[in-house]
Amino acid sequence: MDANAIPADRIAPPKAVLFDVYGTLLDVYSVGLRAEQMFPGAGEHLARAWRDKQIEYSRLVSMSGRYRPFWQLTRDALQVSAAALRLPLDAAGEDSLMNEYRHLSAFPENRAVLLALADRGVRIGVLSNGDPDMLDVTLRSAGLIELIDPILSVHATRRYKTDPAAYALGPQALGLAASEILFVSSNCWDAIGATWYGYTTLWINRADAPMERLGIQPTRVGHSLRDVLEFF
């Protein structure tokens, strides 16, 4: 946990935890292994460009009121990222990488942390940009789905995070004030968006990235999902 963290005795234990999925519970860059097999020397570049373009597109369609489902945005982002890198991605290769996205690797500490929260009687959910079908498949593949309820998708609002309508799904589903819910994300922009909305927040800064400069910070910053347990 970061040195500037708010002391534990100044934060009431949250009544529920909502996790982001992509990048937080699941490693979005694990697709780079398959990409590297297909395009030796360029797999990691493709994985990172793909993720960046996916986030860019989610913001663009939200700002413009032109919603497209996350599965389609993910495919769109893959196509343009491969083209930008001059990689010969054919239809079969595209389908292979998209299938890989359905089966992203979970971070190794996840299950133990979720089980520890369940043992404490904490309700555990997710709030994700992913489509409902995407989330069902990928959380099953990761072996986590039986530990998670509710599974909240922004598809219900047709607005991607950081739109307030997306974050409103949590309090509505859980019957709690946003401040009573711990929102956990490995994306600083997502943690900040949730903080603006009123959640108690934890940014999982796995990459030791600098804090965004937006006049606000997440409640706490950690480096592993295990840091969630310090709230309880």
Where are these regions (language model features)?
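Short helix-capping segments at alpha-helix termini
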Residues: 39-43, 84-89, 143-147, 175-176
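A metal-dependent, Asp-based hydrolase signature
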Residues: 44, 58-95
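A generic alpha-helix surface/boundary motif
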Residues: 29-33, 75-76, 133, 164-165
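Short, acidic loop-to-helix structural element flanking the phosphoryl-transfer center
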Residues: 71-72, 89-126, 133-136, 164
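Asp-based, Mg2+/Mn2+-dependent phosphohydrolase catalytic module
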Residues: 2-15, 115-118, 127, 131-132, ...
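Hydrophobic side chains within well-formed alpha-helices
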Residues: 31, 46, 93, 144-147
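Active-site neighborhood of HAD-like aspartate-dependent phosphohydrolases
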Residues: 6-55
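Alpha-helical elements of Rossmann-like donor-binding domains used by nucleotide-donor carbohydrate transfer enzymes
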Residues: 33-34, 49, 76-80, 96, ...
